[in-house]
């Protein structure tokens, strides 16, 4: 990802404007663009929605798949790598998506977070969200968390 993400057609620093909006089995979140590192026809101060094909939720099973990265929190700044507009607007605001071919959501907080590793066992890696709700990343061991943090630090140095 260190090589792939910097080649993304759209790289932005954003701040969430609203909490995530759930629809069908997924969600999207409205953000304000703070800085454009790459991408055409995008400007600081404008608002867009961000979505990801891998963000899934099942109300019946009480499960969410956040692609290893937590929701963006109000008032914080994030570095996001987007692939394209999905050709759809919500309330006149264009919707962009994270790259489909990545299992990990390409969203990185400019803040430092305390990440809790919640013990898992058996076949499932699902954990109670309330136990990890302040995390930036979700990992099952320190090796995985260290890899996320190394990638984050590399990217934040590049896109300050």
Language-model segments: residues:
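Beta-strand/loop nucleic-acid-binding surfaces
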Residues: 42-69
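Conserved positions in beta-strands of structured domains
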Residues: 15-18, 34
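Short aromatic-glycine-enriched beta-strand elements
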Residues: 22-32
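Short, conserved beta-turn/loop elements at beta-strand boundaries and strand-helix junctions
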Residues: 18-24, 38-39
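Short coil-to-beta-strand transition motifs
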Residues: 3-13
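Netrin-like (NTR/C345C) domain of secreted extracellular proteins
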Residues: 61-160
